[in-house]
Amino acid sequence: DIVLTQSPASLAVSLGQRATISCKASQSVDYDGDSYMNWYQQKPGQPPKVLIFAASNLESGIPARFSGSGSGTDFTLNIHPVEEEDAATYYCQQSNEDPWTFGSGTKLEIK
């Protein structure tokens, strides 16, 4: 299985500043020119919500302050400017190879 290592496990960011979350895969999640890495946001008591698909594509309805980048094994989620409603846990997920796997999550606190 592909192992996804997220960092940091938690972070606290001041309102209006930038939050950066990294995800490193144990092997490439690229195939035929696309990177099969996705990012999710989960708030307590709610199901995960897709933010970014295929590394850098913004899901419909997601604010443009969320952005994703990377390819191969190294990926980044950026949130800027951070808003209070962004307090949540964020997960990377690869969909290149079965079984699809998730990172362990990053909890974002807004200061």
Swiss-Prot record:
Spans annotated as Framework-3: 61-92
Annotated stretches, region: Framework-1: 1-23
One CC-aspect GO term: immunoglobulin complex
One GO term of the biological process aspect: adaptive immune response
Superkingdom in the source lineage: Eukaryota
Region (Complementarity-determining-1): 24-38
InterPro entries per the UniProt record, alphabetical: Ig-like_dom, Ig-like_dom_sf, Ig-like_fold, Ig_sub, Ig_V-set, IgV_Light_Chain
Disulfide bonds: C23-C92
Region (Complementarity-determining-2): 54-60
Family annotation (Pfam families): V-set
Chain spans, region Framework-4: 102-111
Region ranges (Complementarity-determining-3): 93-101
UniProt cross-references to SUPFAM superfamilies, sorted A to Z: Immunoglobulin (SSF48726)
UniProt signal peptide: none
Keywords: Adaptive immunity, Disulfide bond, Immunity, Immunoglobulin
Region entry Framework-2, spans: 39-53
Protein name per its UniProtKB record: Ig kappa chain V-III region PC 7769
